[in-house]
Amino acid sequence: MSMFYVYVLKSERAEYHYIGSTEDLKKRIQEHNQGKTKSIKHLVPFKLLYYEAYETRTLARKRELELKRNSFKKKELFDRLER
């Protein structure tokens, strides 16, 4: 069974976090670090800060959007990561 992931990357160049979702986490991080995401290629390299695994793409996408749209949920997660 495939898993789907929601992930948080941190730029090693700037104080910037990127939230995304994917089925292949390793490949997606490589794509980010190869500059294949135009909107953030100027911020490479990235390191994986956090991820969550889900059984369906729908659940992963729902969580990704929740983190991107809900500043409280995002802040709550980032506060936990900083401990």
What do the predicted segments below correspond to?
Residues 1-44, 48-53, 58-68, 72, ...:
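GIY-YIG nuclease catalytic motif and its immediate N-terminal context
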